């Protein structure tokens, strides 16, 4: 039986290709550490980040692949990133998801009065407020709640809260 199962043809291969429009990439913090002044609103950085996202999307679609677009908090404030996601959702059937990464943007810093940006570093009370803020901003932009979300790390309390508060979420990706 095992021999037969190992040699059967696989009918379906599932690939979940995830792109995040990173308006303020976390790697940009390393540039600051090399003596450059921090500017999370740097237009050149925003343009470069958006160009990378557009290229990823174009290449995926040219090769017939659908994509899960994980919108970051920062990208929800970028009209072009939102329009690309809406377009690719309608035209190619890409999923529009929500990442709890990409928090370090001017809007986040002003609202939460911190430069911290890792969701797992906040108190549970603050995590809930951030999740509510991010999910409601997503809903305002797209008219629905995402079916998937993710972060580098999501503890059980945060995962359970997200699922309870936002039942459309069926998947959480934590790397």
Q: What label would you give each PLM region?
A:
Residues 1-148, 153-175:
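Catalytic alpha-helical scaffold of carbohydrate-active enzymes acting on polysaccharides/glycoconjugates
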């Amino acid at each position: 039986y095992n021999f037969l199962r190992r040699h059967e043809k696989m009918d379906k291969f599932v690939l979940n290709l995830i792109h995040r429009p990173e308006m303020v990439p976390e790697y940009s913090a390393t540039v600051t550490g090399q003596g450059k002044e921090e500017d999370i609103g740097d237009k050149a950085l925003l343009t470069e980040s958006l160009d990378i996202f557009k290229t990823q999307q174009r290449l995926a679609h040219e090769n017939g692949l659908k994509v899960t677009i994980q919108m970051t908090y920062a990208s929800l404030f970028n009209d072009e990133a939102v329009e690309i996601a809406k377009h690719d959702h309608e035209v190619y059937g890409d999923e529009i998801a929500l990442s709890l990464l990409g928090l370090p943007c001017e809007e986040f810093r002003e609202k939460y009065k911190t430069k911290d940006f890792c969701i797992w570093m906040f108190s549970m009370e603050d995590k809930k407020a951030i999740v509510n803020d991010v999910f409601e901003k997503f809903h305002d932009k797209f008219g629905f709640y995402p079916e998937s979300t993710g972060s580098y790390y999501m503890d059980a309390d945060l995962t359970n809260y997200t699922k309870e508060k936002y039942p459309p979420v069926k998947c959480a990706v934590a790397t």
